[in-house]
């Protein structure tokens, strides 16, 4: 798990976000989205997802429900039918 980025985001949620007020147009909020991304994906992909989400959270976006994409499931065996 990516504990350091999650702790930094929790710090932001506890001490900085209350001063700024609610402003995220998405559900889950951008900071909760980032925490989920770091829980589900590696550091680099989670960082990319977080940056892309924050860039999309702007006055010109509609917002709405935008969950973290799930980890892709790779097939464990041969996909051909054996006969």
UniProtKB/Swiss-Prot annotation:
Pfam families: YidD (PF01809)
Cited InterPro entries: Membr_insert_effic_factor_YidD
Segments for region (Disordered): 62-83
Keywords from the UniProt entry: Cell inner membrane, Cell membrane, Membrane
Top-rank taxon: Bacteria
Topological relation to the membrane, as annotated: Peripheral membrane protein
PANTHER family xref list: MEMBRANE PROTEIN INSERTION EFFICIENCY FACTOR-RELATED
Cited function: Could be involved in insertion of integral membrane proteins into the membrane.
Protein name per the record: Putative membrane protein insertion efficiency factor
Protein's organism: Chlorobaculum tepidum (strain ATCC 49652 / DSM 12025 / NBRC 103806 / TLS) (Chlorobium tepidum)
């Amino acid at each position: 798990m990516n504990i350091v980025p999650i702790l930094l985001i929790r710090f932001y949620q506890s001490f900085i976000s209350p001063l700024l007020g609610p402003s995220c147009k998405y559900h889950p909020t951008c900071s909760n989205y980032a925490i989920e991304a770091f829980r589900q994906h590696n550091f680099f992909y989670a960082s990319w997802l977080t940056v892309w989400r924050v860039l999309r959270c702007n006055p010109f976006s509609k917002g709405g429900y935008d969950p973290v994409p799930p980890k892709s499931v790779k097939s464990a065996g041969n996909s051909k039918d054996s006969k």
